[in-house]
């Protein structure tokens, strides 16, 4: 089955700021592209039930699930890992174990340590699943402007740059 005719059933692991960005983008695809596969916003998973319920209602997800329910859900064939950085490794491990998940998108950072990265490489190579890593904010105008300002040297010689974008 090719991508144009396959129904994409998406599950989000995470319901915070970057998840809102992805939900908006997915819901907007049909306005920008003439040939978009059928996309179902199947389930959203987050630690707090109240926030995942609100997120599901706001963005049109069918279900709001706890992590164990999410991992067991066989209707999800595409997982977006959008939670806090510290849980990316754990969430990737869980997503790779989902029999129905064919595709996994992982927001940066991939993991928190070299050891996690090495474990991830081994686990991922055994599954044959498609995994993509992304960094969406890098291309936003505000981040590009902030980085350009940093590079001017007007801030001296910074050793760390922590940008919050809301």
Give a label for each model feature.
Residues 2-59:
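N-terminal Rossmann-like dinucleotide-binding module
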Residues 6-8, 102, 129, 159:
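Nucleotide donor/acceptor-binding cores
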Residues 18, 153-166:
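NAD(P)-dependent dehydrogenases' Rossmann-like dinucleotide-binding region
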Residues 20-31, 92-96, 145-150:
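Short, well-ordered amphipathic alpha-helices
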Residues 34-35, 63-74:
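Short acidic low-complexity segments
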Residues 42, 62, 75-77, 102, ...:
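Conserved acidic residues
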Residues 78, 84, 89-138, 153:
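Beta-strand-loop-alpha-helix segment that lines the small-molecule cofactor/substrate pocket
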